[in-house]
């Protein structure tokens, strides 16, 4: 009996150890266990803050109820700031902070949202300075240019509609199999009244294999958008 108890405790401890590695947390995110991934990532300290920010943003975007989305983006912001403090040379940390601020702008007042717009741009530029081939940052920056230009305030921040398509094309060239890039590109094209091109991007996105929970959710979004465009 003691042997089985000891064995059981040993297996439980092994599970705890495995759950508290960056790779294990990343796997949890890929499987859609986002709240658990956030909690486990925080336990990793400096090694887990980027993952905590990612998990929090994903939870807010994919699973959270409307009333709790803002608070989860707050968590993402806090974790991303800690990630930058821990490693100022990590492009992913700046990317996650930009992502959190981009979403938080939807929940904050007008003046604070304007300040966040500058933060999004600056942090994406920092991410790209550290990693010029960061496809996700290119996609986010393309959306930043589109959003501010279409809101009529692009001139205040240096946003330029002419940057939107080139940035998306660069990102897709770097990561042609990434579903979310295609879906976001399609969304931008539709907003620019280039619906035929948007349809092609959505159809391509749906032809790609969904390897993660996020991929599955992004393809669900693609299907819905495709139905609306056709």
Describe each model-derived feature in a short phrase.
Residues 17-63:
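N-terminal leader/linker segments that initiate helical-solenoid repeat arrays
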Residues 24, 52, 57-59, 97, ...:
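Structural register within alpha-helical repeat arrays
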Residues 179-184, 188-191, 199-230:
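Terminal, low-structured helical/coil segments at or just beyond the last alpha-helical repeat
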């Amino acid at each position: 009996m003691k042997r089985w108890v000891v064995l059981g405790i040993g297996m439980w401890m092994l599970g705890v150890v495995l759950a508290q590695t960056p790779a294990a947390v990343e796997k949890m995110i890929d499987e859609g266990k986002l709240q658990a991934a956030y909690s486990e990532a925080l336990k990793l300290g400096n090694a887990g803050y980027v993952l905590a920010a990612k998990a929090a943003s994903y939870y807010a975007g994919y699973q959270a109820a409307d009333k709790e989305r803002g608070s989860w983006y707050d968590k993402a912001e806090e974790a991303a700031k800690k990630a930058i403090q821990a490693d100022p040379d990590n492009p992913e940390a700046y990317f996650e902070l930009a992502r959190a601020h981009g979403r938080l702008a939807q929940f904050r007042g007008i003046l604070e949202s304007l300040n966040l717009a500058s933060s999004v741009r600056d942090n994406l530029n920092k991410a790209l300075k550290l990693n010029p081939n960061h496809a996700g940052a290119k996609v986010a920056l393309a959306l930043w240019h589109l959003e501010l230009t279409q809101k009529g305030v692009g001139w205040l921040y240096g946003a330029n509609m002419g940057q939107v398509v080139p940035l998306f094309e660069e990102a897709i060239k770097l990561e042609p199999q990434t579903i979310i890039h295609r879906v976001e590109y399609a969304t931008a094209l539709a907003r620019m009244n280039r619906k035929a091109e948007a349809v092609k991007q959505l159809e391509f996105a749906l032809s790609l294999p969904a390897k993660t929970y996020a991929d599955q959710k992004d393809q669900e979004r693609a299907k819905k958008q495709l139905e609306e465009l056709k």
